[in-house]
Amino acid sequence: MINDELTAAFNAKPRVDINNIKKMTPGQLDQVKNYGSMAENLLKNKNFALFVHHYKFDMSDAVVGIAGHNEEDNARRLSIVHNIAGIDRFVEFLQNAVRFKNMAVNIQSPVNTKGNINE
């Protein structure tokens, strides 16, 4: 069942075109920065990193534990490998959010990292 908290979390997702980051309004840039900060906090959390690595090790052990070579065993192996790839894609998603946050900060700063004044 969808509750108000879930709806608020879904609506908090920034709906901006990252490909046109230089044309964003200050409000949109603030959304990107807030979202990126949340992602950065997750990536810096040692407990989160520990659980991600434990999950990947657990999945790797599950793959090694499949001894058979029939179609069902191969399908289980493939499913587990997709789970491992999924967690890697999630971490990449978080890293991209941080990268976009850094781009937004650079755009809003009066002097960018190259020493040029932003107009």
PLM regions: where:
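Intrinsic-disorder/low-complexity detector
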Residues: 1-119
